[in-house]
Amino acid sequence: MADDNFTVVTEFILLGLTDHAELKAVLFVVFLVIYAITLLRNLGMILLIQITSKLHTPMYFLLSCLSFVDACYSSAIAPKMLVNLLVVKATISFSACMVQHLCFGVFITTEGFLLSVMAYDRYVAIVSPLLYTVAMSDRKCVELVTGSWIGGIVNTLIHTISLRRLSFCRLNAVSHFFCDIPSLLKLSCSDTSMNELLLLTFSGVIAMATFLTVIISYIFIAFASLRIHSASGRQQAFSTCASHLTAVTIFYGTLIFSYIQPSSQYFVEQEKVVSMFYTLGIPMLNLLIHSLRNKDVKEAVKRAIEMKHFLC
């Protein structure tokens, strides 16, 4: 009996979003369209920035990095989720689950760092424009992006290593559509208090630090914008920052709800809805938010279309 109680789990069953076959078919089509749009738009933005010399600036370099991360972190979840919507019993091996968690964690943490770097870029451009070329040189941009990736990797490795040290016994049904930490911790037969503390400490500190960086940057930007005499100048400054601030608010709002809360306040169904939004919704919305009112991007797209028609 004791041996049966402590059978080692080699795979997890992902319960997903629903058991209804008809709804699964509808969700498959909807999520496939969203994922395809996300990939095409983000990869298209990267290509557009590469081929348009006018967009070879720190701001658009960072935007291309953000687009790459968005494409990656949606790809860490969406393909497996789409496959699971087509099968009766969705399973994932323990090793694949850890890899999925690692990839998703790296990408989403890196995104948080990148958003704070983009806020710093806007801060320097508006508050100290004379120092902009020095503060945001090509080398500095590469260093900031590299640091963002390193931060994402280190943070996620800590959680993944601590997660692998846990024992998973008989229970292996994950009440989620991917290997999310809170859902996995609920299945462990080990003491998970240290994992919860690490999650709250590291992810919480990183989220708060990067979010405060954004907020402080925009406070200085707001004061600097008010000192701009021309109305058009103020409007341009606010317009440039509004899109990024919107993306930041959506991103951190969903993450704080999902991760920075005690397990006693963890509601599975609400978490699934929020997770669906930040795994598929945010990567698609980010690009729309950043490019919707961006004249440079619109002009670059128009020129690219005209060039295509000319070549044809």
UniProtKB/Swiss-Prot annotation:
Q: Which Pfam families match?
A: 7tm_4
Q: Does the keyword Thylakoid apply?
A: no
Query: Its GO CC terms?
Result: plasma membrane
The UniProt GO MF terms for this protein read: G protein-coupled receptor activity; odorant binding; olfactory receptor activity
Where found in the cell? Cell membrane
Q: Which UniProt keywords apply?
A: Cell membrane, Disulfide bond, G-protein coupled receptor, Glycoprotein, Membrane, Olfaction, Receptor, Sensory transduction, Transducer, Transmembrane, Transmembrane helix
Q: Where are the transmembrane segments?
A: 26-46, 55-75, 100-120, 140-160, 197-217, 238-258, 272-292
Please give the PANTHER family that the UniProt record associates with this protein.
OLFACTORY RECEPTOR
Job description of the protein: Odorant receptor.
Name of this protein: Olfactory receptor 5J2
Q: Which organism is it from?
A: Homo sapiens
